[in-house]
């Protein structure tokens, strides 16, 4: 247990009983301030100190994928930095890539608060944020300004969602609008059709609704950016198989498995202090440790169905190097974290990388790319 887990995390989670969203926003404001002034000595020094503390050079874990170089396979999942305000900072925390968003074409406030809950006894979270963000145009401006200040050090993904005000039958144009505004600023793009917190969004995972989205975005993709689809862990296997076929048909770059779940497995948490309700009564997506097994099962299914030929970003319940390795062995090419990072603290990425190095050494492998994972 590190200093963050033994002192700071309990203070924030229990002593203050703070609204998790308030804490997150305060941290993002600090990150935004550092990022905005990163071309000046004080902020530049802070970034250097963060990198010295939390980064770990791991050339044996680097990956070449989609024409991009990932310094290591551990990335920040979408949802934390929705508006990209700290996009240039995440590499200093040791991440090998980062994903901003989810962003929508129209700015939107999201769902009413409280909408983010921590379940420490389960190492989990529930959120029903509802894609709160400043909009695609604002994100494009933010990323353009960041690019002028300093060169990007890690690949940046942009996660696109459908605006709540946009009818489902107009979803294609909504996604296209965001993609056109942001195409120049992302190294890869993710289409989110699997969040449980936008009414009707998950219905876009059906073949009839999904195919026009995949086709239109690939046709618009003149710069040939890698396009990925983020899927739900709650899909039936036959529905997932249909999605895999469509992704292959339209030559998309890969899948992100998985989003949060609407399932409520048996949890230790009985009452959420902010609302006085049980987790079963709270709407929203469940993330963290309870999602680990299901997300890994989905990763393994995709890997088997595609013969290991379709890249997968694995996300869901990663807290330790063993968790990350399990997903890699199931078929994940890259790994994302979010809830685990909140619980484990900023030193988590370094711990994961150290553990992954050990896994390679124990198997006598020189690099992660040499790993043989039979479908």
UniProtKB/Swiss-Prot annotation:
Substrate binds at residues 82, 127-131, 192, 197, 259-260. Pfam families: DHO_dh. Its cofactor is FMN. One of its GO terms (molecular function) is dihydroorotate dehydrogenase (quinone) activity. Binds 1 FMN per subunit. Keywords: Cell membrane, Flavoprotein, FMN, Membrane, Oxidoreductase, Pyrimidine biosynthesis. This is Dihydroorotate dehydrogenase (quinone). Its main location: membrane. PANTHER family: DIHYDROOROTATE DEHYDROGENASE (QUINONE), MITOCHONDRIAL (PTHR48109:SF4), DIHYDROOROTATE DEHYDROGENASE (QUINONE), MITOCHONDRIAL-RELATED (PTHR48109).
């Amino acid at each position: 247990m590190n200093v963050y887990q033994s002192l700071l995390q309990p203070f924030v989670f229990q002593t203050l009983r703070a609204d998790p969203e308030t804490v997150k926003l305060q941290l993002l404001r600090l990150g935004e301030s550092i990022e905005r002034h990163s071309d000046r000595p004080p902020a530049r020094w802070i970034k250097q100190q963060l990198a010295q503390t939390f980064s770990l050079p791991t050339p044996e874990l680097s990956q070449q994928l989609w024409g991009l170089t990932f310094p290591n396979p551990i990335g920040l999942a979408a949802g934390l930095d929705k508006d990209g305000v700290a996009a240039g900072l995440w590499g200093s925390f040791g991440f090998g890539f980062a994903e901003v968003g989810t962003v929508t074409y129209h700015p939107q406030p999201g769902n009413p608060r409280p909408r983010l809950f921590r379940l420490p006894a389960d190492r989990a979270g529930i959120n029903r944020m509802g894609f709160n963000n400043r909009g695609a145009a604002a994100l494009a401006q933010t990323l353009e300004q960041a690019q002028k200040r300093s060169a990007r050090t890690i690949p940046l993904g942009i996660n696109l969602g459908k605006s709540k005000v946009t009818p489902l039958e107009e979803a294609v144009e909504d996604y296209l609008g965001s993609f056109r505004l942001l195409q120049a600023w992302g190294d890869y793009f993710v289409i989110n059709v699997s969040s449980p917190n936008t009414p009707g969004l998950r219905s876009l995972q059906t073949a009839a609704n999904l195919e026009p989205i995949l086709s239109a975005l690939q046709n618009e993709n003149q710069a040939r950016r890698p396009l990925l689809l983020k899927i739900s862990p709650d899909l039936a296997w036959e529905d997932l198989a249909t999605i895999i076929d469509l992704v292959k048909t339209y030559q998309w770059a890969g899948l992100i498995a998985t989003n949060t779940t609407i399932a409520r497995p048996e949890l230790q948490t009985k009452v959420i202090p902010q609302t006085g309700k049980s987790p079963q009564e709270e709407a929203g997506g469940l993330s963290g440790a309870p999602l680990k097994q299901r997300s890994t099962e989905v990763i393994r299914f995709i890997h088997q169905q595609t013969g290991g030929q379709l890249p997968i970003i694995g996300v869901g319940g990663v807290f330790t190097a063993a968790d990350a390795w399990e997903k890699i062995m199931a078929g994940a090419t890259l790994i994302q974290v979010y809830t685990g990072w909140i619980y484990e603290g900023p030193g988590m990425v370094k711990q994961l990388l150290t553990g992954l190095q050990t896994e390679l050494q124990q198997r006598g492998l020189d690099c992660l790319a040499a790993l043989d994972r039979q479908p």
